[in-house]
Amino acid sequence: MRKIYFRADASATIGYGHFIRTLALADMLKDDFDCTFFTCHPTSYQVEEMEKVCPFIPLQEETHSADFLSYLQGDEIVVLDNYFFTTDYQRAIKQKGCRLVCIDDMHDKHYVADVVINHGITNGNLFSTEPYTQLCLGYAWALLRLPFLQLPQIQRKNRKIEKAIVC
């Protein structure tokens, strides 16, 4: 089975969106791929959530970049989601022979990734990419957890709102 390594960090104060959407993608793909999640200093909540989806490997803050690269054999797909992963770091992953997917909502750096996912309504011309980079832009690419993916299947009664107070 093909391997996918997911790399995202979060703390008690920042980054949970990156962690949650990347874990949502792992959950979508876990039946068809051998998924492993890599993160720095996971909280007990993160550990609990990752254990529901796939194996995980905690990384040390001081050496996380080099440590993650040391796991790569070159046959993996790597998914990065963090503002701090630079173009040089992307290049290091690509030089290992891996396919690379970057989840982005800033478009503030050059991408050497094979695929860039941005679920916002974004102009592709705002991205600096390699000629081979495929851009996956717009709501169709939103990485949602299973409960939110199932919402459209729930029957709703249309109720007419007759009175409303706006403050």
Label the predicted regions:
Residues 36:
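Conserved beta-strand positions in the Rossmann-like core of class I SAM-dependent methyltransferases
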Residues 113-167:
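A nucleotide-sugar donor-handling region in carbohydrate enzymes
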